[in-house]
Amino acid sequence: MRSLLALLFAASVLAADRPVVDHAAYTAALKDFRKGSAKSIEALKKTDASAAVRLAAVDDVRERLVDEPTSPLVGEVAALLGSTDVETAKLLLAALAEAKASGATAQVAALASKADSPLRIPAALALAEVGGAKAVPVLASLAKDEALAENIQDALVKVAGPGVTDAFVAGISDAKADVSARNALIKAAVGRNLRSVAGALCVAIKEESMRLECQKALLKLAQPSDLAALRDAEKAVTNATTKGALGRLIKKLEAVK
């Protein structure tokens, strides 16, 4: 089942950026693409294709990607992202996101990481859909950009797939990573109710720069099985407020153990 984020992303992009084109020309082109008498991906490679033909080509590509999200078409579409016009690229990103086409992860991540790209936000949102666990560190690294922070937070809450939880734990535990990236992961973990990161929080809370965010998250995510790690954290921290908060949390969890 397609995720809500993918559908909302695709819908918002399509609503905002679909050009007004000649309906008859669009319908005729789409019919040709669907019959196979013309190839939509080839039409998208042509710089002189009309707006109606390009839009029909995008819609045909989107349908094919949804039907076959692991087909070679994914690579062809991904290769176009950096060379086609911005509006077409946005529509193609939405198509890749809707199809959860993981084969496009590298190209989408590259766009999301490009500071001067007008595609940064749509690429970051698409990355949450296509990248799975691989998207987590890339998205977290973008959190330091205030212009992207809110979108990145939403994407981190929604990203799904095998290994995502482990990627959150690894990112929170990485003492060499930027504090903004680790804090973004912590906030998203709370949004996901990801209780399995509590152990990593108990370690990270010993770092002064991480203390407050970890403290707030532990109050929401810690459970009785984390008591040993919480006691260790309480002994290690020197901030009186945090030490007191952990002490109260420990007593609360001991009472329900």
Q: Where is each model-derived feature located?
A:
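Amphipathic alpha-helices of TPR/Sel1-like and other helical repeat/solenoid scaffolds
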Residues: K39-T47
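Sec-dependent N-terminal signal peptides
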Residues: S3-S12
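Low-complexity, intrinsically disordered Gly/Pro/Thr-rich segments
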Residues: L227-A236
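Structural detector for internal amphipathic alpha-helices that build alpha-solenoid repeat scaffolds
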Residues: R18-K35, A43, A52-P69, G75, ...
